[in-house]
A protein has these predicted regions:
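Active-site activation/catalytic loop segments of kinase-like enzymes and analogous catalytic loops
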Residues: 357-390, 403-424, 434-439
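Juxta-kinase regulatory segment immediately upstream of eukaryotic protein kinase catalytic domains
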Residues: 101-159
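Conserved Nudix-box catalytic region and its N-terminal flanking loop in Nudix hydrolases
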Residues: 2, 11-53, 61
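A cross-family kinase active-site recognition segment
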Residues: 235-302, 323-325, 353-354, 426-432, ...
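Active-site catalytic-loop/activation-segment of kinase and kinase-like phosphoryl-transfer enzymes
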Residues: 116-136, 140, 266-317, 444-448
Length: 451
């Protein structure tokens, strides 16, 4: 994918920014990811073409506003360049302009906003994550080097940005063995490092090994597992892989369910408690006029009423089956589980909570879309894995309700995520809640059509 990059590079002295001879922002087109991994191509260009080592604070790719195949307008903000750096020919530092000039319209509002901050030397807003603030990259890189060395895994090269978005950031660095990743998470996911370490200690076959954590910063270092994601295996093999993934998560959940002490440890470490009993009120708020679960401003009252009533009925039927509360993943999809040797390894426990494990099925089949063989294999394996802990036939009878409560849970999750993002970056998490609302309503429509 072609990225149409527009740069905001502050000068080493305050009140200046890198500009072209025409007074506009520097711009170039490069090949790269159109989403949160755009930072890889951006950092490589700055490093290799300009010799600029200033950390990238933000990439702002607006992929939804352009047609398929068109270059993605992407605004880039860096830390100030060092005084010893020499700009490329045709570029020079000049006073911060009042406007960004002729930039593509999708990135114009963000360019105006960031230029105003630079002109006024104002601090970033409260909701801007730490990795989009000056000094974070050097601090995180220094800790990554020290912590990795202390763990017996010294780095053999510099950490480089791998992923950058409002809810998380990743740095990647080489070692004599597999690469290491430093993951940083935003405040609602602040407990992920400690939770992941606790789960990895209890379930080393299913959760990646944690090399180090920094709880106050919300950092963890994990090893690159270097294997194929379940969602990337050949389509003919995917039903079996999805079945294995379902069994792996349920096995972990069944082991945790009777262990009150282990669940209490997770809660004490910061895992939220999200009982199904709270789901009806939470989803009503998430799709209401002040909600962020399905875009801004909610949905029509009559439509919302139908959804809330359906969620209430589904909660009652699912709770009657008696699935025990346990740790839930919260974002269990086929891009968060890998086949490593002969086992399934589940990553990205950002959304982990203590709740009813019914909520994890809907995401596990979401990426299969209309591939019914995959959906059936994953669903059957999930149901079979819970049989014995509960009445398997009773659980199978409420599969629709399981999917409804899972979809509602996701809408509430997206509401919490989006309201904790800086407004200008909420677009990066728009659409997820809408997808699960459609999933929920499709079940209701199918049932009504069958009557």
């Amino acid at each position: 994918m072609k990225l149409d990059l527009w740069f905001l590079v502050p000068g080493p002295s305050g009140g200046t920014i890198l500009l072209g001879a025409d007074g506009g922002l520097p711009t170039v087109q490069v090949e790269g990811s159109e989403t949160e991994a755009a930072v890889i191509a951006v950092a490589a260009y700055l490093r290799d073409a300009w010799g600029l080592a200033a950390p990238v604070l933000e990439t702002h790719p607006k992929w939804k506003e352009v047609g398929e195949g068109e270059p993605i307008p992407t605004l880039v903000l860096t830390e100030p360049a060092r005084a010893a750096w020499t700009p490329p020919p045709g570029l020079a530092f000049a006073p911060v302009p009042a406007t960004p000039g002729e930039v593509p319209w999708p990135i114009r509002p963000r360019a105006d906003e960031l230029l105003a901050e630079l002109r006024g030397n104002t601090p970033p807003p409260e909701l801007r994550p730490r990795w989009m603030r000056r000094g974070w990259f050097d601090r995180a890189s220094t800790w990554m080097r020290t912590a990795s060395s202390d763990a017996g895994r010294p780095l053999t090269g510099d950490p480089r940005p791998f992923f950058l978005r409002g809810i998380s950031a990743l740095l990647r660095a080489p070692t004599d063995g597999p690469d290491l990743f430093l993951k940083a998470v935003f405040p609602p996911f602040h407990a992920e490092p400690v939770l992941t370490r606790l789960l990895a200690e209890r379930f080393p076959e299913t959760v990646p090994t944690v090399v180090a954590v920094e709880p106050d910063e919300g950092w963890l270092i994990v090893e690159d597992i270097g294997s194929a994601w379940v969602g990337d295996v050949p389509e003919a093999d995917r039903p079996a892989a999805l079945a294995r993934g379902a069994r792996a998560l349920v096995g972990l959940q069944r082991a945790m369910a009777p262990d009150d002490g282990a669940r209490r440890t997770l809660l004490d470490a910061g895992a939220p408690h999200r009982p199904l009993a709270d789901l009806v009120a939470s989803v009503a708020a998430a799709i209401g006029p002040d909600g962020f679960g399905v875009g801004d401003g909610g949905i029509q009252p009559e439509r919302a009423r139908r959804v809330v009533e359906a969620v209430g009925a589904a909660v009652a039927r699912v709770e009657a089956v008696g699935l025990p509360e346990s740790v839930v993943h919260g974002d269990f999809h086929s891009g968060n589980a890998a086949i490593v040797d002969d086992r399934i390894v589940i990553i990205d426990w950002s959304d982990a909570a203590i709740s009813n494990p019914a909520i994890d099925l809907v995401t596990w089949i979401a990426w299969s879309r209309d591939r019914q063989a995959e959906i059936d294999a994953a669903t059957d394996a999930w149901l079979d894995a819970w049989s014995g802990a509960v009445d398997g036939e009773a659980l199978r009878a409420v599969v629709d309700e399981v999917l409804i409560v899972g979809a509602a849970y996701q809408i509430v999750s997206y509401d919490g995520i989006r309201r904790n993002l800086e407004p200008a970056t909420r677009y990066t998490m728009t659409g997820g809640g809408d997808h699960f609302l459609k999933t929920l309503e499709a079940i209701l429509d199918r049932r009504e059509a069958a009557v």
